């Protein structure tokens, strides 16, 4: 243990996710004792500073997982003064809430008195109050007296203000937590705010991001062949790829799930979600239209969905959309595959069609396959095609 590490509390991160590892690595490099729980294995990895320096991300860590020192999950949580809840979420629909609640109960039942729980999963309105009630029920402790709770939603939406906001129970300030989360960037401040206020701030950020996007997706569905002028296709709004649409979808659904009854906000959230679902259908229709326009037979065509994504990020919405897109394309086209990372396409007897789901993927495909006969479709509001 390094000098100065004795001033930092023992910390456990629950969840072998990209966000969880980023937290664990950052805290370990400060010299704190850190454990990283793999809930699927029921074990915790002891993350020392040298390991945090060796493994740049969770993918590299997972590859060498069997070689790392581990301890039981209950012991890692019980020894910790601070427990960050950052699991990988892979369930969808109504199963999401049950899955997250199950993981949270697993983390909470082993906490000790005077420990602090930091919930990093984005929520809607009132979910944190439910979490607090659950903690008190499971542990028998009193919130704010025997145990403490914070809300720190992991953010995927770019923000102009780089300050970190942490929701606290009864506006409690925590200098130790601030130390664990501090960075070398003097411009980034840590602000403790009321939990309810942070739920509102996060919801405004998500809805502000998606309301404009949903409007673009809906309007662009009215663009017909022959109307795709340079002004339309070169517009910045046509740089919205499927990857961008999926980035905060979990958060949007969480907000919708927390709303009851009928209200303008409920209609706004549900309408936005339906726009995204319609966008996926539109992409499939565009692919089918391309086959028809070029007089291509589905049996003689191979479609590759090119979408490079982080397989271990907390939210599973990109994987879910990828699965939906792949399944629906297979209803019309016999051979459909997914690829990520390096895109090298070799000649085959079939016509090759590639759907680029992010700007980085599109640029990579074009760069690596300059002389190829690929048909490349950009997964944007106005799906442009390159041959």
Predicted feature descriptions by range:
Residues 61-116, 343-367, 372-380:
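Rossmann-like NAD(P)-binding element
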Residues 9-28, 36-40, 273-323:
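Glycine-rich adenosine-cofactor-binding loop
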Residues 199, 209-296, 301:
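Interdomain hinge/lid region at the active-site interface
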Residues 21, 87, 103-105, 109, ...:
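Rossmann-fold dinucleotide-binding core
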Residues 33-82, 89-96, 135-139, 324-349:
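Conserved N-terminal Rossmann-fold NAD(P) cofactor-binding segment
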Residues 41-47, 125-130, 312-318, 361-365, ...:
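Short, charged/polar "capping" segments at the starts of alpha-helices
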Residues 15-18, 38-40, 86-88, 120-123, ...:
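Structural motif
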Residues 118-121, 149-151, 371-387:
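Short beta-strand elements of ligand-binding domains
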């Amino acid at each position: 243990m390094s000098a100065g590490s004795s001033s930092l509390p023992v910390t456990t991160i629950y969840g072998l996710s990209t966000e969880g590892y980023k937290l664990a690595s950052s805290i370990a490099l400060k010299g704190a004792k850190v454990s990283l729980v793999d809930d699927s294995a029921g074990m915790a990895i002891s993350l020392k500073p040298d390991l945090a320096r060796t493994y740049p991300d969770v993918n590299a860590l997972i590859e060498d997982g069997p070689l790392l020192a581990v301890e039981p999950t209950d012991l890692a949580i019980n020894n910790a003064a601070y427990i960050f809840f950052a699991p990988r979420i892979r369930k969808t629909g109504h199963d999401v809430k049950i899955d997250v609640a199950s993981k949270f109960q697993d983390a909470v039942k082993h906490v000790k008195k005077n420990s602090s729980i930091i919930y990093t999963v984005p929520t809607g309105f009132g979910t944190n109050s439910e979490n607090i009630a659950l903690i008190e029920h499971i542990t028998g402790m009193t919130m704010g007296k025997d145990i403490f709770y914070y809300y720190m939603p992991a953010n995927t939406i770019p923000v102009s203000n780089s300050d970190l906001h942490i929701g606290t129970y009864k506006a409690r300030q925590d200098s130790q937590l601030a130390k664990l989360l501090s960075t070398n960037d003097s411009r980034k401040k840590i602000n403790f705010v009321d939990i309810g206020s942070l739920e509102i701030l996060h919801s405004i950020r998500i809805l502000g991001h998606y309301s404009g996007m949903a409007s673009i997706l809906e309007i662009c569905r009215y663009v017909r062949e022959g109307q795709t002028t340079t002004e339309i296709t070169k517009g910045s709004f046509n740089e919205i790829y499927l990857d961008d649409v999926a980035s905060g979808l979990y958060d949007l659904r969480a907000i919708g799930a927390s709303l009851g009854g009928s209200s303008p906000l409920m209609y706004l959230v549900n309408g936005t979600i339906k726009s995204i679902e319609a966008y996926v259908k539109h992409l499939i229709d565009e692919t089918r239209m391309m086959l028809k326009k070029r007089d291509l037979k589905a049996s003689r065509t191979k479609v590759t969905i090119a979408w490079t994504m982080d397989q271990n990020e907390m939210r599973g919405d990109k994987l879910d959309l990828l699965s939906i897109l792949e399944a629906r394309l297979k209803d019309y086209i016999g051979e459909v595959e997914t690829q990520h990372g390096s895109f090298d396409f070799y000649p085959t007897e079939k016509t090759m069609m590639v759907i680029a789901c992010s700007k980085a993927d599109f640029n990579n495909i074009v760069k690596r396959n300059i002389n190829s006969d690929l048909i490349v479709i950009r997964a944007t509001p106005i799906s442009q095609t390159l041959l």
